């Protein structure tokens, strides 16, 4: 059973080798079952104040979203889901949504409100603030875990 294609949009490129390796590891595992398109939008100029940088990055994210994308935006103040709940959400979107699920990870300074307003759901990975590079890897691991749950593959305990 292949689910609908997924998409992830994030700000900036992974620069640190171990984050790149970890992301590639989970992308390879996910792609056994489901196509996942990963889009990196250019981050804002570091010389800009954080609010202006967020606004610029927010515009780039919103422009990168296709009209039919079902945006699942990651934000520290979002709804927390267990891994089985994320799997159930992906199953529901596979069955009911017209577009593909598109996870959105902001940059080092978070997200502009315009991105949250475009969201179908705003989700949180943790009560703790995570570096955006780590958040990307955690998200990919959770997508892989959700796929294992949906397929009853022994990975989630």
Swiss-Prot record:
Record-linked InterPro entries: Alpha/beta_knot_MTases, RlmH-like, tRNA_m1G_MTases_N
Any Pfam family hit: SPOUT_MTase
EC number per UniProt: 2.1.1.177
Gene3D superfamilies for the chain: 3.40.1280.10
UniProt catalytic activity: pseudouridine(1915) in 23S rRNA + S-adenosyl-L-methionine = N(3)-methylpseudouridine(1915) in 23S rRNA + S-adenosyl-L-homocysteine + H(+)
Stated role: Specifically methylates the pseudouridine at position 1915 (m3Psi1915) in 23S rRNA.
PANTHER family, per the entry: METHYLTRANSFERASE, RIBOSOMAL RNA LARGE SUBUNIT METHYLTRANSFERASE H
Transmembrane segments: none
Gene Ontology terms for molecular function: rRNA (pseudouridine-N3-)-methyltransferase activity
Assembly description: Homodimer.
Family, as annotated: Belongs to the RNA methyltransferase RlmH family.
Keyword field: Cytoplasm, Methyltransferase, rRNA processing, S-adenosyl-L-methionine, Transferase
Binding positions (S-adenosyl-L-methionine): 74, 106, 125-130
Species whose genome carries this gene: Desulfovibrio desulfuricans (strain ATCC 27774 / DSM 6949 / MB)
Main location: cytoplasm
Domain of life: Bacteria
Name used for this protein in its record: Ribosomal RNA large subunit methyltransferase H
Keyword Transferase: yes
Enzyme class of the recorded protein, top EC level: transferase
GO cellular component: cytoplasm
């Amino acid at each position: 059973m292949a689910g609908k294609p997924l998409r992830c949009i994030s700000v900036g490129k992974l620069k640190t080798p171990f984050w790149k390796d970890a992301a590639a590891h989970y992308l390879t595992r996910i792609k056994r079952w489901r196509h996942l398109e990963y889009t990196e939008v250019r981050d804002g100029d570091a010389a800009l104040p954080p609010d202006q940088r967020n606004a610029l990055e927010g515009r780039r994210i919103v422009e990168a979203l296709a009209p039919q994308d079902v945006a699942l935006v990651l934000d520290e103040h979002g709804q927390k889901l267990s891994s089985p709940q994320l799997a159930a959400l992906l199953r529901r979107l596979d069955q009911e949504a017209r577009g593909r699920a598109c996870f959105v990870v902001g940059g080092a300074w978070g997200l502009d409100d315009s991105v949250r307003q475009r969201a179908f759901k705003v989700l949180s990975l943790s009560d703790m603030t995570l570096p955006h590079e780590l958040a990307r890897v955690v998200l990919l691991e959770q997508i892989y875990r959700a796929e294992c749950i949906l397929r009853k593959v022994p990975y989630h305990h």
